[in-house]
Amino acid sequence: MITTDGNSACATIAHKLSEVLAIYPITPSSPMGDLVDTWSGKSRPNLWGAVPQVIEMQSEAGAAGTVHGALQRGALAATFTSSQGLLLMIPNMYKIAGELLPTVFHVAARTVATHALSIFGDHSDVMACRSTGFAMLCANSVQE
């Protein structure tokens, strides 16, 4: 048995199956970006024996744009986000889905803050993306 948390499990799969990982820290998905950055910094290879390129951007919108650009060039790319960060990625999500480019946005679902800061978990951020054309695969628990 391997003991791990959801962020570590998600980061492991993303690092092994990607060539480009665009990151920008936002709670609660920050540990995923930190882990893949550390692993690439230590030259840990993906499944194809190459070290994924990790690019930290100035915003979530920049991370989504980086993923879009990498996909356009034929790279396997992914990112990590939640809450308001996911909302900033929506314009690029429409383009990525419309161009039928394969990617994964790993989302740690969190309440979209309205009148006050909120760190509670719900699916309001994910539900805001329903019309983008992205296929959504969701787990019922961290273990799944």
Functional labels for PLM-detected ranges:
Residues M1-A128:
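Thiamine diphosphate
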Residues I119-E144:
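Conserved thiamine diphosphate
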